[in-house]
Amino acid sequence: MPDRAQVIIRIVPGGGTKTLQQIINQLEYLSRKGKLELQRSARHLDIPVPPDQIRELAQSWVTEAGIYDESQSDDDRQQDLTTHIIVSFPAGTDQTAAYEASREWAAEMFGSGYGGGRYNYLTAYHVDRDHPHLHVVVNRRELLGHGWLKISRRHPQLNYDGLRKKMAEISLRHGIVLDATSRAERGIAERPITYAEHRRLERMQAQKIQFEDTDFDETSPEEDRRDLSQSFDPFRSDPSTGEPDRATRHDKQPLEQHARFQESAGSSIKADARIRVSLESERSAQPSASKIPVIGHFGIETSYVAEASVRKRSGIFGTSRPVTDVAMHTVKRQQRSKRRNDEEAGPSGANRKGLKAAQVDSEANVGEQDTRDDSNKAADPVSASIGTEQPEASPKRPRDRHDGELGGRKRARGNRRDDGRGGT
């Protein structure tokens, strides 16, 4: 007795929709952009849905869910609003019988309350393959309650075995004999192939067929056999002339270019080595090698910096001073040189202005002292002349006004005491 065909009911993984636009896209795909008919549930008298009413129908399903917030981002939505199921029949099954049996099965499972609730659903019947199949999209929100459709192994009615057995029972009434036994009952222990693996195998087979149909034969079979029989020799010569043939000359050109490249690379390494040796000898001859400027990639560098750059370019690494130390040493040396040049050149413009202001202040102090001690100066011209003399102002600190007054008074008292004209 031949084995009977098995019932195939597949819940599409990831086939549920979470947004309004996803529902619209799913229904448009199943209707092939309006070319196929979408039918409502038995509750709606199996009325077909026109293509221009798909958006309106999807909006009503979203409203029935009761949890859809238009302001919420699509990325934040986690609740599946629909479930996608495919009921397949064996190849060669009568298409009318398969359509009627699958529609009756959908009404029994989701529209009659068989599984504990009633749900809205749509169907699309496809015969584009050898085996006819029916797509069923179920609105997961109950019509008369607040529950959600859930198909699982633990559900008493809506489990995988229950779905297949009900499909075999209904199909038998329409003249389609199907087997709903499990794999274990049929003695099959290996893991079944998944739908993703099945689709991958289909794509690989299609690519293989396309590859075999492509014509890559551009040469004669005799030339192919001759080319395969000869081993590759880059220096093969033409037996008739004794000279390398045209293909051989073309093959030798890359080899010659490679040899010239290696020769130029070796000469570059030798040149870098010569530069490094000359720099080291120059550094040993000079007591301060850092004072020898060498033009580099970033301006004027010291010999140490140039040597470091040469070492880096030539791939030679030794125990020479780090470039950072040389740079810090150069900066400090420039600062000391600038400070020494400033001292030799004299005070700057700001310092000259400060000295001039100090001299003017000193002259004002002298004039005030002359006014206060005018009588003493008139009596003693020598003391007056001494009083008018002022020491040279220091460039670092100007004379204080009170210091000048006290010095003049002391000198005046000292002069009077020496002349015997007063003083205690």
Curated annotation (Swiss-Prot):
Record's compositionally biased regions (Basic and acidic residues): 243-261, 394-408, 415-424
GO biological process, any: symbiont-mediated induction of tumor or growth in host
Keywords, in A-Z order: Crown gall tumor, Endonuclease, Hydrolase, Nuclease, Plasmid
GO MF term list: DNA endonuclease activity
A UniProt-annotated Pfam family: Relaxase
Region of interest: Disordered: 206-269, 321-424
EC number, as in UniProt: 3.1.-.-
Protein task: Tumor formation by A.tumefaciens involves the transfer and integration of a defined segment (T-DNA) of Ti plasmid DNA into the plant nuclear genome. The virD operon encodes a site-specific endonuclease that cleaves at a unique site within both 24 bp direct repeats flanking the T-DNA.
Protein name: T-DNA border endonuclease VirD2
